[in-house]
């Protein structure tokens, strides 16, 4: 699996594995409704519409990866997808051929399997460290409770993985719960990686799991964080987000100074980024 080398900053992105350590059969949806001005646009394209938009051939490996078409036959041909062992091989190869490359995790990683539940997320925490994750943000991770998340951050991840989330604050005084961003030097280029945790956690998940944390999209604070990172010398600013792609597209139109948003949550297989124009230029959004 070779990708052409270009540029001097390489960022690898994974998201929404939902604690699946082993390969699985995965079928893309045959319905993805877009409402209002998003109707018929990426990421709301499925089947033949998606193939046509991105120029993929029917019955190809790309067609199997990104659509539901001929799923049973394609699954027999190409087999299962995913698995941390295979992912580790790819990550090692990418990092070996791209010095300084970082692996970003968009969240929904620690929860979703029996072993993750029984081990209180420890199996996935250890797997992520072994995989070489560098920076991550959160959603279902918070279902383990505030104390467990902070314990993992302060003990397991210390010196290994940064948890970032500009939109998670304490409910009493509005203090940051996590670092809003981290600055990484990649081959001499200062790169700011901002975190955007799932904004609707308190209503999508039981509130008792995060009673002292507030969330929300917080576009204004995102702009403030971007400006702060730029003022600190960042030549590249990216966001690892768990908003969902439609929310990311809207955020990209409102916040200037973000080069790219690596999205998650909505599980939209997007082969190429969507270019969003804004007051500062443009932002690339993918999922």
PLM regions: where:
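N-terminal catalytic scaffold of extracellular/periplasmic and nuclease hydrolases
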Residues: 1-287
């Amino acid at each position: 699996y070779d990708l052409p080398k270009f540029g001097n900053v390489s960022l690898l992105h994974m998201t929404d594995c939902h604690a699946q350590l082993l390969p699985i059969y995965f079928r893309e949806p045959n319905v993805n409704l877009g409402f209002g001005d998003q109707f018929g646009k990426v990421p709301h394209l499925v089947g033949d519409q998606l193939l046509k938009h991105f120029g993929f051939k029917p019955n190809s490996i790309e067609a199997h990866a990104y659509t539901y078409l001929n799923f049973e036959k394609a699954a027999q041909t190409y087999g299962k997808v995913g698995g941390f062992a295979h992912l580790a091989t790819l990550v090692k190869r990418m990092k070996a051929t791209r010095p300084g490359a970082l692996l970003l995790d968009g969240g929904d990683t620690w929860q979703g399997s029996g072993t993750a539940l029984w081990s209180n997320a420890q199996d996935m925490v250890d797997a992520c460290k072994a995989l070489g994750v560098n920076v991550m943000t959160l959603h279902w991770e918070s279902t383990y409770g505030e104390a467990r998340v902070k314990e993992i951050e302060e003990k397991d991840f210390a010196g290994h993985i940064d948890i970032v989330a500009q939109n998670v604050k304490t409910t009493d005084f509005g203090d940051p719960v996590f670092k809003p961003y981290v600055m990484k030097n990649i081959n001499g280029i200062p790169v700011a990686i901002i975190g955007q945790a799932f904004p609707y956690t308190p209503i999508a998940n039981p509130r008792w799991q995060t009673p002292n944390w507030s969330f929300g999209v917080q576009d204004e604070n995102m702009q403030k964080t971007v400006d702060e990172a730029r003022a600190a010398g960042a030549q590249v600013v990216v966001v690892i987000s768990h908003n969902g792609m439609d929310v990311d597209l809207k955020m990209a139109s409102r916040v200037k100074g973000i080069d790219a948003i690596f999205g998650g949550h909505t599980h939209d297989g997007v082969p190429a980024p969507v270019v969003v124009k804004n007051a500062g230029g443009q932002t690339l959004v993918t999922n």
